[in-house]
């Protein structure tokens, strides 16, 4: 919307300046005219050649957008509506509005305009009507008001004459002041609407930021820490061996340990005491060849088995 408003402003300002600069007004005519009750009055205005084929009309009101049409040229160069007629002279680039049998109610603000796209070109004419007892012109005469622009052709009066001491004021006019005010008001409304829309969008973004403060904080931290850091890494490669070395085989010795099934008891048996005494006296023991050493083995009887030697 902001871009749309910025795009609309320059052409509008240029259009307004075009109507305010002297010499750029497309229509010229009298700013005020005076007529007499019961008589006829002609109002002539002149237009530029580029509006030669456009429709011309005469309306009552001070605002062109709300002006009430009285008479308008259609397919022909002349049209009539009651006591008011309009005639378009395309050769001289003028059109004349004739008001017949004037009354006091005819006094007011009128507009002479050219129908164009968008905003019509127009100028405002103040019509004054005076009672018939005030001599303005000789009876039965018709007065015609003409335009004498500096940059266009000049046309003199064709019927009657303007009495001495009575002067008509001709002022070039563009868009009337109410039209300009309405255009400015429209642009102001457009600007206010654009500002409100931008404010609403800003409020929505603020509400979303308040709902997710952690996310906003993380985004801020990420933006603060967005500086790039670089580290140089050096990789050392090991030289390849020609042949892979097979893993060394460790010799393993296995041994089986078995518990004895029976407990062994050993007993020393001494056969005579004399030998013990001789040993005590220091005599070396002697052993007869006939004597043999006997060994005995004592086993613990098993449970449930009877002794074989009672």
Curated annotation (Swiss-Prot):
GO biological process: establishment of localization in cell; intracellular signal transduction; mast cell degranulation; negative regulation of B cell proliferation; negative regulation of B cell receptor signaling pathway; negative regulation of eosinophil activation; negative regulation of eosinophil migration; negative regulation of fibroblast proliferation
Cytoplasmic side: 200-310
Ranges per topology, Extracellular: 27-178
Disulfide bonds: 45-112
Membrane topology annotation: Single-pass type I membrane protein
Gene Ontology MF terms: phosphatase binding; phosphatidylethanolamine binding; phosphatidylserine binding; signaling receptor activity; transmembrane signaling receptor activity
InterPro entries on file: CD300_family_receptors (IPR050671), Ig-like_dom (IPR007110), Ig-like_dom_sf (IPR036179), Ig-like_fold (IPR013783), Ig_sub (IPR003599), Ig_V-set (IPR013106)
SMART domains per UniProt: IG
Signal peptide: 1-26
Subcellular locations according to the entry: Cell membrane
Transmembrane regions listed in the UniProt entry: 179-199
Biased composition (Basic and acidic residues): 291-310
Domain of life per record: Eukaryota
Keywords for the protein's UniProt record, in alphabetical order: Cell membrane, Disulfide bond, Glycoprotein, Immunity, Immunoglobulin domain, Membrane, Phosphoprotein, Receptor, Signal, Transmembrane, Transmembrane helix
Major location category of this protein: membrane
PTMs per UniProt: Phosphorylated on tyrosine. N-glycosylated.
Residues recorded with modification Phosphotyrosine: 295
Domain Ig-like V-type: 27-128
Region (Disordered): 136-168, 271-310
Biased composition (Polar residues): 136-161, 271-280
One of the record's GO cellular component terms: plasma membrane
The protein's assembly and partners: Upon tyrosine-phosphorylation, interacts with PTN6/SHP-1 and PTPN11/SHP-2 and INPP5D.
Family label: Belongs to the CD300 family.
Entry function: Inhibitory receptor which may contribute to the down-regulation of cytolytic activity in natural killer (NK) cells, and to the down-regulation of mast cell degranulation. Negatively regulates the Toll-like receptor (TLR) signaling mediated by MYD88 but not TRIF through activation of PTPN6.
Protein name: CMRF35-like molecule 8
Species this chain originates from: Rattus norvegicus
UniProt gene name: Cd300a
């Amino acid at each position: 919307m902001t871009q749309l408003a910025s795009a609309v402003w320059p052409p509008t300002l240029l259009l307004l300046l075009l109507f305010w600069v002297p010499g750029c007004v497309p229509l010229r005519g009298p700013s005020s005219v005076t007529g007499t009750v019961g008589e006829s009055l002609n109002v002539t205005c002149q237009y530029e050649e580029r509006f030669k084929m456009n429709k011309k009309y005469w309306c009552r009101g001070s605002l062109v957008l709300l002006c009430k049409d009285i008479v308008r040229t259609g397919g022909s160069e002349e049209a009539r509506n009651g006591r008011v007629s309009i005639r378009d002279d395309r050769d001289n680039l003028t059109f004349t509005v004739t008001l017949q049998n004037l009354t006091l109610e005819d006094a007011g603000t009128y507009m002479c305009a050219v129908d164009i796209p968008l905003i019509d070109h127009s100028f405002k004419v103040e019509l004054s009507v005076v009672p018939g007892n005030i001599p303005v012109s000789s009876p039965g005469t018709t007065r015609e008001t003409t335009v004498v622009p500096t940059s266009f052709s000049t046309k003199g009066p064709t019927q009657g004459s303007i009495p001495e001491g009575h002067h008509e004021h001709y002022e070039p006019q563009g868009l009337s002041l109410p039209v300009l005010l309405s255009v400015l008001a429209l642009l102001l409304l457009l600007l206010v609407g654009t500002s409100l829309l931008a404010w609403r969008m800003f409020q929505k973004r603020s509400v979303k930021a308040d709902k997710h403060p952690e996310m906003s904080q993380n985004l801020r931290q990420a933006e603060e820490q967005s500086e790039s850091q670089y580290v140089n890494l050096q990789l050392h490669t090991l030289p390849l061996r020609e042949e892979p070395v097979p893993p060394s085989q460790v010799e393993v010795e296995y041994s089986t340990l078995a518990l004895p099934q029976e407990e062994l008891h050993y007993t020393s048996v001494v056969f005579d005491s004399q030998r013990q005494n001789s040993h005590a006296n220091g005599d070396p023991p002697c052993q007869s060849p006939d004597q043999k050493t006997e060994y005995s083995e004592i086993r613990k009887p098993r449970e449930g088995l009877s002794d074989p030697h009672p």
